[in-house]
Amino acid sequence: ELKNILLQDKDQYYQTFFKKDFEVRKINNINDYLKIISKSVCDYHSSEKKKIIDSIEKINTQIKKIKNKYPQFHFIHLDKFLSLPWKFGLVCSKKYENGLPHTRQQYIIFEKKYLENISQKSLMKTLIHEKVHVYQKMYPQDIQYYLNHHQFKKIKPRESKDLIRANPDLDNFIYHDKHFNTYKAVYNNDAINLEDITYFPHDTQFYEHPFEQMAIKFEKIIN
């Protein structure tokens, strides 16, 4: 099922690639990438499933405790968050999206070695972070409230000349905050992979995009 989702590209993620996005993935076109993806998808082993399930159970327990006191956290309705189904995919190669955790439609995608090596505490934070991105896709109106409250404004769509990294967890717009700081992750001049970027206005992922900022803030729901 994951292979079909990645190959069909119904979320049109590959359509957001510009010249630099192709270069850092070492591909000439989308067909090259589809061939790589076909060989990258794999199945979860029972140990990997257990690691994820154990983490989800702890997450749900903690959020349920908080929910009675705070029905919302950073503009995310906790009932809605808990009711969103967890869907996962696994890839066995860093050739697809450099092995970075991300979402495609409602699926959270991990790379096998990343999942093997991550601690449970870090996995819990990553799971929450990525589920926020699923929530953002499912409930755009809630996200608009967040953007309005924090006075984020859309400036323009991303263009090739901006050299901003394509990211399946984000929309394809550039935003600035109430202080007119423009948020972006820009490829370095000598970039050879997806992670060769610099964040602006400050070099931390918090400033890549308002959607990333929201997800990073929400991670703090667990301690």
Question: Where are the language model's segments positioned?
Answer:
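N-terminal mature-domain "stem" immediately C-terminal to a signal peptide or N-terminal signal-anchor/transmembrane
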Residues: 1-49, 215
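Short, flexible loop/turn elements at secondary-structure junctions
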Residues: 90-94, 112-114, 132, 136
